[in-house]
């Protein structure tokens, strides 16, 4: 490892040698890999923690005000909306913050989905998923410590929902979330930078649909954290198996569209010849040329946002 200031890497003046400067510029691949892994782990911990802390506090607030005289009563419409908004907006804002750091996954089912398409390496996934689980436990524990009363945000079946029904509800809703990630974040286009909004909306509508039936997990970490703090049910496995089944279902659907080269079926939609800027194509599928549009003269960078003309700005400042 290069150490600036050592005799081997400095000249008579005490300044770094040209070789030392070049080594620092090129970098140490092993050290860089370790640093990147650390950044990803820290990003996933911070993002998962903040997402779930805000979500748990919002959900706890809705649950304690839902029907104080009957804690087991079905959610009232305003309570349901409150919970859905808490999870959806908390996820959207934290994905927007951390997607450049770690990818903003915060969900083992999403991580599995990204591993399946090659967007996340299996080695990174082995670091990320335990980090997400620890962050979820931490968020649940702090929520329990901050707010009075019993922690109520554990997932549970309700209104006569069977275990089998719960598994498939979680599977289909998670598949919707993972497909949202695939087509808005993995597939690069001019609105990729708005993917956090779509992902948040997907979680919002999932909670509208399923909270009265399964409590809405769609995220094994979200279920695991509160269960560790407040206690497990006998059927907690449905909140782990269901979302992972949803990831597999979404991958199968996405794979079919990629094999069929879906881009050629409805050409020109959200497309500005992004192949020139390194459009990501998984599985090595070829993309047919698309007709030119009036925006083809814009060189898309940073998710399709045109670069500002710094020379013009500099001239104006002189």
UniProtKB/Swiss-Prot annotation:
**Keywords (A to Z) from UniProt:** Glycoprotein, Membrane, Nucleus, Repeat, Transmembrane, Transmembrane helix, Transport
Protein family: Belongs to the MIP/aquaporin (TC 1.A.8) family.
What is the name of this protein? Aquaporin-1
Subcellular location field: Nucleus membrane
Record topological domains on the Cytoplasmic side: 1-36, 99-108, 187-193, 258-318
- TM region positions: 37-57, 78-98, 109-129, 166-186, 194-214, 237-257
UniProt cross-references to Pfam families, sorted A to Z: MIP
Q: How does it sit in the membrane?
A: Multi-pass membrane protein
> What does the function comment of this entry state?
Probable water channel involved in responses to changes in environmental conditions and conidiation. Involved in responses to hyperosmotic conditions, oxidative stress and cell wall destabilization. Also required for proper transcriptional activation of genes involved in aurofusarin biosynthesis. Not involved in pathogenicity, but negatively regulates deoxynivalenol (DON) production.
Region annotation (Disordered) ranges: 1-27, 268-318
Query: What is the gene name?
Result: FgAQP1
* Enzymatic reactions: H2O(in) = H2O(out)
